Amino acid sequence: MKTISMPDKLTPSQRSYCMSRIRGKDTKPEILVRRGLHARGFRFRLQERRLPGKPDIVLPKYGVAIMVNGCFWHGHKGCTLATRPKTNMEFWENKIARNRHRDEVTTAHLEALGWTVITVWECELKGKETGEARIQRLAEEIIQAGERKRQQEAERKSSRAEARKERERMLERQAALEAEINALYPIPKRIRKASKE
C-alpha cells in the first residue's frame, strides 16, 4: 500500500531542531517516577550502562529494572497518546515497530540475567491521582520483587550449602574406602603418592 506523504510545514533545519529537543532521558514521566520512588524511601541508579538497554531506573537491592516508556515512541497499544502521524506513515510504522522489538529483546535479556523488569507507561502517570496510584502500585511491585529476590538468594545459598555438605560426605567416604583398601592390601607409600599425582 502506497502512502501519500504530505509536505512538512517546517523547514529541514526547523524540523531538525524540533527533533533534537526530544529527550532520551530525564523526561517528565521519568522524573515523576523518580520523585515518587525517592519520596517512598527507594534509592536507585539511573541509566545503568552495564545492563542491556540501559534501563531508566535500576534498583539493585530489589533486582528491579524500570523502563519508563513514552506511549508514542514505544507504541503503547490502545493508548490515545500513541496515535501515529498521518504523514510519512511507513517510516513511523517501521520506527515504532523497531522500538517495540528492541524493548522486547531488552526485557528478555534482563529477565534472563535475573532482573524483574517493570514497564511504566506515560499515560499511566497522567493526572495527579492516577499518577500517584501508579507510583504506589510500582512501589508495591518493587517490594514484592525484592522479597522474591531474597527468597531465591536464600534457596541458592541453602542449595550451595547442601552441595558443599554432600561433597564433604563423599570425600569422607572416599577417605574411609582408601583406608580400608590400604589396611587390606598394603601398598608402599611412594606408589600411593605416585598414583595420586
Where do the protein language model's features map onto the residues?
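Nucleic-acid endo/exonuclease domains
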Residues: 2-119, 124-197
